[in-house]
Amino acid sequence: MTTNYSEPDPLVCDETYSSSIEILKYLLTISYLIPGGILHLFILHTILVTRRGYFKGSSFFAIFALDSVSSIIIVFIDSFYGRLFLYVPPLCPIVGPFFWASSLIPKIYFYLSVHTRLSKCVAHICMVLNRMTCVLMPTYYGQIWRKLTKVSLVIICILPLGGTWNIIISPRFYVLPSYGGFAISYVRAIPWASSSLFQSIYILTALVFTFICTSVTLYKLISLSDRIKSAEKSLCFSNIYISLTFLAAAASQALYAFCTSCMSSDLLFTAQFLAFDMFTVGSAVILFWSNSQIRGLILPSKAEDDRIFRVQTINNSFTH
């Protein structure tokens, strides 16, 4: 088979950037990414392991758990690959040639980076629909989502393939100089099918769902607050706060996609990173901060610890 593309030029690291400033950027970035990823891990462990029986009937937490998996992957690959090699210039001449010669690792990183971001968009659509259904049809909400939860989880995993298929079939991935380090790019098998185009489509679609569903949810929370359980109400407000972080990510993506004169702006590039970082780690921080249920389960009070200790002591006394 003949490939109709020209090889990009070999990597030449840009030495005009200050190593100390770029490394400081990296340290500042991981100072919030890694704690946010750890918080996602705690929440995921609580939902799936330590309090599995408590959460297994919750459709919202099932969707949030899958969203947390995407967030953890994003934090891991960005902290220890993407941002590391982008913002630490001394690594560029050492590591860059290796990734230039082998395109498998850059391809895996690039694919995971795009797939998980699209997955988070789809998961967010499912979460705002879940909360809207809760306030619109509180009586039938449980029945509806018992049928929809598994379907939603499959869709969250599969639907991003609609935006990553060209990455899978693309013949060449390579590194290019950026911010003193290097970033990943690729030769598109289908020239028009860029990853940024698909990300814009997914994000803007999620933006429409977010605006409509969140508006309806907020209106119903205000008008029918006495008919909604306090636990469900707390989740609704948590999701509204998460939606605000998504709106910031969507706005920066839309500006980057449709403002051609803005694409070369370092400020917008940084703002886009920060906005999606806020959406990635912010969901865990917001759920922990605004939801007393999840906060109490991750950080139980001394009274709860004493109660668990007494139960364990009683159980042990019966087994001896």
Swiss-Prot record:
GO terms for cellular component: membrane. InterPro entries: 7TM_GPCR_serpentine_rcpt_Srg, Nematode_SR-like. The keyword Transmembrane applies. It is a multi-pass membrane protein. The chain crosses the membrane at residues 29-49, 57-77, 85-105, 151-171, 197-217, 240-260, 268-288. It is found in: Membrane. Keywords: Membrane, Transmembrane, Transmembrane helix. It comes from the Eukaryota. One of its GO terms (molecular function) is transmembrane signaling receptor activity. One of its GO terms (biological process) is sensory perception of chemical stimulus. The keyword Transmembrane applies. Pfam families: Srg. Belongs to the nematode receptor-like protein srg family. This is Serpentine receptor class gamma-15. It comes from Caenorhabditis elegans. The gene is srg-15.
